[in-house]
Structures are given as structure tokens and as C-alpha cells.
Amino acid sequence: MPPASTSTTNDMITEEPTSPHQIPRLTRRLTGFLPQEIKSIDTMIPLKSRALWNKHQVKKFNKAEDFQDRFIDHVETTLARSLYNCDDMAAYEAASMSIRDNLVIDWNKTQQKFTTRDPKRVYYLSLEFLMGRALDNALINMKIEDPEDPAASKGKPREMIKGALDDLGFKLEDVLDQEPDAGLGNGGLGRLAACFVDSMATEGIPAWGYGLRYEYGIFAQKIIDGYQVETPDYWLNSGNPWEIERNEVQIPVTFYGYVDRPEGGKTTLSASQWIGGERVLAVAYDFPVPGFKTSNVNNLRLWQARPTTEFDFAKFNNGDYKNSVAQQQRAESITAVLYPNDNFAQGKELRLKQQYFWCAASLHDILRRFKKSKRPWTEFPDQVAIQLNDTHPTLAIVELQRVLVDLEKLDWHEAWDIVTKTFAYTNHTVMQEALEKWPVGLFGHLLPRHLEIIYDINWFFLQDVAKKFPKDVDLLSRISIIEENSPERQIRMAFLAIVGSHKVNGVAELHSELIKTTIFKDFVKFYGPSKFVNVTNGITPRRWLKQANPSLAKLISETLNDPTEEYLLDMAKLTQLGKYVEDKEFLKKWNQVKLNNKIRLVDLIKKENDGVDIINREYLDDTLFDMQVKRIHEYKRQQLNVFGIIYRYLAMKNMLKNGASIEEVAKKYPRKVSIFGGKSAPGYYMAKLIIKLINCVADIVNNDESIEHLLKVVFVADYNVSKAEIIIPASDLSEHISTAGTEASGTSNMKFVMNGGLIIGTVDGANVEITREIGEDNVFLFGNLSENVEELRYNHQYHPQDLPSSLDSVLSYIESGQFSPENPNEFKPLVDSIKYHGDYYLVSDDFESYLATHELVDQEFHNQRSEWLKKSVLSVANVGFFSSDRCIEEYSDTIWNVEPVT
């Protein structure tokens, strides 16, 4: 099938009607209509046609009966099924399509409203959008009001749909379980982006998200013999009823080739022609994002890569069957998976290709929308704010400069002024080694014109630096976008993002201060501190309280006498919960909510474990549920957690060996379940070794009958948003124990606190602000401070000291092969990293403090339960600052300069 037209013409009429009773033939449009265009078309449409169109206009359903009509219609016509073969999956698809119909009606109105009012828009570029399940989110967020009974329907669409499905013979819970998590992200970066698009829709910010439509997600994680095994995530196998395929929106994207200068163009600063060697098409898929209690529906546009020519008939007819589809395979690999393994050259090139493909398609879509308004280019920054979520979309800076200079023929400096006023960059790391870099050779091969532009950007930038600091010669090499010191010259993408943006923000107060004094201190010296701001991360309470923990949301609503749950829009209302910390009846209900959530989690773990109950259900209320669920990485220190578990297990065994009764052991080490979840990058050997160790420890501990269920260890495979919604509400304690000064913010800590779980953590990332907001008495802090880290690392390197005896005994036990009898040296790299290779993440320095803090946790949870419950309530009461609505308000005011459109 030939590709659809990629024309972005503004011409509306392609053929005049031959009769006054006919509607003129109109072109398919890629964007909304301006008011003058609507008026022009309106005059050409016959009155009879307009009247019929209005009469049969699709309307939103607002009653259970109307939903049932729409549902059955989709079952029988869209899905071609019937009453007799409509299973839960078909019910999910039909329900999703019915809900989507409502959202699309509001989506069209929202987009037309934005086009008509022409406000400044926000474009949020993120390589990840970890959206979770869409149906339940839509049921909570969507606005339904029955005009005949607005009070009864207001704020209760989920209850209405639940009842409607019950009448049709389906359980809402079973229907919701049919939806796979969208494979569009991995960790906190993608979940932050998802929370932000939710809040932007809720706040009425005119915004679109731009990402990629990964066919196989990042990967599905299986645990086989304790090892992580990556398999494709076939999340699209049954289709995706939420997306709208836009075959008419196809943007050609070029790679490789060479640069030509037209006559008169003598330098790289003049308009040049990039003659590409390979071209693919970016095809748009739209995903409606509903706001909460509003008819605003924003858009998430995802790009899929397709070839310009899918099939080479000449090669096929000549018997070259393999190469006849080679172009298709090369193109489709671009959006096959998130983060291709870059441990080898082809994977590295594919990653860069993926990033440019996404940036180019997104930027050209943004430019098309702007050009429609016919404003001068100087007004572009007044109409467009582009937020770079990490360094992955930094190529958009270079692409905009290329388009303005090469295609729009603007002067270089005029174009650069527009670029730097348009972009803002969010940094997500304080670790120098985590900053993204690309080899110059690879970059020039794939994107030759962009390399020229980067050289020019750097040249002008370094000129300005030299003028300001003529005597500081070393500053030029430290601050240069091009790194010269490595074996191969590298492009430092974070530096490019800073130079090309008008604002740079960190994501927690500590993080924002650290980047100004460490990795970006030279830029602060040049630009001054005002360019660098802080916007502490947040999470959407609609997803992480209402959807994840409906029983807690209901208790809060009843306690605050807030039947329409307005507190989900104004989280400051939660502070009223503080009045109930001495109310025994309320605390009893609060504890029951937690117990019910534990039962829900135990059911999930049983299901994941082939129907075997790992956790003893008899003592759930007296069992501390201790969670660490996040990406597996050495700096997040899952190894510290598992070493602590081993220490606890060995101490219990020693007590029994020395004649203590199980009751005496239980008094010293009360009941506890340690739960892990998270994925390692496929090529990250040490992280995968940590996963293996956790599972080996679980095998030994969980099958040791001598400790009688006092300690259990669980690794939940393939951790995702849906599993997080079950795990997080069940937590008593969660672990946020990164080495101080390494975690930018973290958002899982906020999710646990919002669900009444206490946290144990280092003084790092958003833990600092959580402690400030909810009170130091309600957080278990331990470990060294960030200002001590470099000195400790230096001492490890040049003045090594003996390990604490507690940690030494743990490492010796691991070295003995007790957890890996078939391969006693299995965990040698992990042990050696601490014993002999500098212990970069300071496990040995924090271990004893960590153990002592866990003793406090045991004491409070088991011996002072009423105090524990009070801390839990106060945590939720004071968590309001961490709503992503507050984040979006701060971005809007301090970075984007945009206002809500209501």
C-alpha cells in the first residue's frame, strides 16, 4: 500500500460542488481549524446538510443505559461478536471503545478550543511514558453528568460503569484485568511523564506529550533459575483500543547522507542541503489523556517507524527474498524496543537513530501547527514551550536550528535566539558517569548536518566563555560540548541541552543544589544561578491514591465529609486528617484498610507463584511488609537491603543454634516480609547479579522451616504500574536507600507515603523534602550525608579500613557458596566490589547505621502499633506538596510562562 500523503497544505477546498445541494469536497486536515477557516467552510455547506449533521451528531453517553447501548453496539459491530461469545477480553475492548468515544468527543472540543484561542502551548518530550492501564484511569478521571440528575452522576462514572457491566453479566475487576500495561516506559522517568500529562490535562494546560510507540516495550522480565531473562513484551498483541492511528500524519525522517552547499553558501552557518542516504516515515498514533473532573482531554502523540517502501518487487522477483523486505525491517527496528542494548556498535547506532527519529518527527509536527497561525518566526517562543525530559530529546534543539537555517532561511543568530528561548531542560541525575554522550564519529555518520551545527553552537558558546573568562583556559575544555579527553571525541548531550535552553531544572531541592555545585558548576559560573531552578517532582493522586487504594480514598472521603473527593484536586485538605490521630475508631479503620491491601498483595504473590502461598496469612496484621520496588541499580542499593536480610537471617539462625526458643527469636526479630521488584538493564551485569542474589536468598530463607515464617523474601517479576498499584498500598515500610547524593528525586517514595507507608531512607533526593513536609519523627533516616561521600570514596581508595564485622560476616557467608552451592563464586564480583574495588556506593559505610535503624523500625511497628498508625496518618495528611498538580503549576509559572485554558 503506498504511503499516505504527507502534505500539510492549508488549502481546504479541493473540488467545487457541482450542485448547490452537495457538500464541497474537503482535504483531510492534520490539525484544527482557525475561526476564519470555519467561517469560510460554513458558508459553502448547504443548510439541509448542516441540519442533518447537527441532528445526527454523536453525543456522549451520560447514563448507564446509554453506555450499555454503546457497549453492545461495539461488541456486535466493531468486534463482530455477540451475546454468545463475548468474553472478558471482548468486554474490555467494547468498554474501552465506549469510554474512548466519550473521550474523543471531548478531545475534539479541547483541541478546537486550543486552536481557536491560540494560546502558548507546551510540548513535553519524553522517551518514556509509563501510563499504566488506561480504562480504570479513564473511569476515574472522565467527566459524566446526567442532565436529568446531575447530582447523582457527578463524580461517579466508575460506579455507574461498574453497575452497567454487572447488569450485562461482567465484573468490572475482571474486565480491568484484561488490559496489559502499555509498554512505553521503564522506571521513574516514564511514570513522572505520565503523572505530568495527567496533571496538565486536569489543570487545563494546553499541552501535548510526544513519545515513541514501542512494539515490544522495554522487555517482559521472567525469572528463570533466579536470573532475569528478557523476553519481548507483546503488549500490542490484541491491539490497543485507546489509540487512534493517524495514517494521514506521516513525517519523513532522514539519516546518513552528506551535506551540500548551494552556490554562495561558503560556511556551515549558511543554509545547507542535507542529502540523506536513508529515509523512513514517522506515523502518528494519538492517545487521549483525560483530566480529572473536567472535559479537557489532552493528547499523547506516539510515533511508529515505517519504511517509505515496504516491499521491493524487483528483488523479490529476482529471488532475493531476504533483501526484498530489508528496508521494512531496518525501519521497524527503530521503534521495536525502548533502550536497545548499547553495549555494541549496532545497538548504540540504533539508540541514536531512535532519538533523532522521535525528535525530528515531533518537532516537525510542532512547527506545522505553529506555521498554520501565520505568525512571524520571532513569535515562536511566545507560542511554543518545549520541555526536554532528560537528555534523550536534546537533538530537538539541533533539529530546530537546522530547520530554521536550512529550510526557513533564517539568519544563524536569529534562529539560535529563537531556539534558546523555546527549550527548557529537566536534569535527572547528579552522577557524571550517567550523563549521556555520543561518539563524534557515529554522530557524523548518522547525522552529518547536525554535527556541523553542534560544532558551530559550541564554537560560538566557547567564544562567549573566553570573552567572559579570558584567563581561565581550562574552563573552555571543561565546559565544551565536545569532550576531547576520551579515546574518542564525544558530544556531551547534557551540556548541549544547557546551552540550548533558557532554563535548567533539577527535580528535588538537594538535587538542584548538587548539580549547581558539582556537574554543572562551570555553567553556573558562566550563566549565573538564575538559569538553574528547582521543581520538586510529584505524583498524581488520582492514580496513586484513588485508583491504587480505593478503600483508603473512601475512608478519607468519609472522614473529611468530602463525597465528591475534591481533596484529589486540593491536597491541602488532607491536613484535616491530623485531627483524627487520637481517634481509636478511626485508627482501627485505617489499620483495616492496610490489612485488606496486604491480603490483596498476598493474593497477587500467590498467583505469581503458581498458586503457592509464600506468606503466612494467619499473622498478616503482625507482619511488617517491607518494600523496595524500583529499577535495579547499584546506586539504588538493593544490595544493601539484601545484605541486611542475610544478616537478619544469620542472626536468627545463630540464636536458635545457641538454644534460644522460636518465641525468643521472634521477640528479637519479629515477623517481616521483604518484597523486591524492578528490572535491570539487559546489559548491566552487576544489577542482574543482585537480582540473582535476591532470588537465591529467597530460596534458602523461604524454605527454612526452623524460622517458622518469621522472615520471607519475595521478588515480584515484571514489575509494572499495575503491580505497583497493588504492592504500594500494602506497604508498612518502603526502602529509599540510595547512596547520598546519587538519587535526583525519586517518586516511589512519594507514592508509598501517599498510601500511608513509612519510609526508611538516606538523606537523598526527595527524601529530604518528604522529611520536611511530614516531620522527621515520621521518617526513618540513616547513613552518611552527601557532603561526606567524596571523602569516604577517597579513603576507600587510598586509606582502606576493615569492614564492619556485621557486613564482613554477611560477605563471608555469601563467599562460602551457601546461596549458590552449584557455583560458589557466583557472587564474587558483587563481594569484591565492596571488599577490594573501593565500595563506590558506600555499602560498608552505611551498613551498621542501616541495621540500627531497622531495629528501631521493628521496635515501633511491633511494640508501639498505635504510634506507628499515627505516623502513617500524619504522613498522608502532609503529603499534599507532592501532588504533580503543584509541579505543573510551578513549571507553568517559572519555566513555560503558560496559563490554563478553561
From Swiss-Prot:
The modification N6-(pyridoxal phosphate)lysine is found at K751. The keyword Transmembrane does not apply. Disruption phenotype: Decreases cellular phosphatidylcholine levels. Growth on non-fermentable carbon sources is severely decreased (lactate or glycerol). Sensitive to sodium dodecyl sulfate, and sorbitol. It catalyses: [(1->4)-alpha-D-glucosyl](n) + phosphate = [(1->4)-alpha-D-glucosyl](n-1) + alpha-D-glucose 1-phosphate. The modification Phosphothreonine is found at T31. It comes from the Eukaryota. GO terms for cellular component: cytoplasm; cytosol. SUPFAM superfamilies: UDP-Glycosyltransferase/glycogen phosphorylase. The keyword Kinase does not apply. Belongs to the glycogen phosphorylase family. This is Glycogen phosphorylase. It comes from Saccharomyces cerevisiae (strain ATCC 204508 / S288c) (Baker's yeast). The lineage of its organism: Eukaryota, Fungi, Dikarya, Ascomycota, Saccharomycotina.
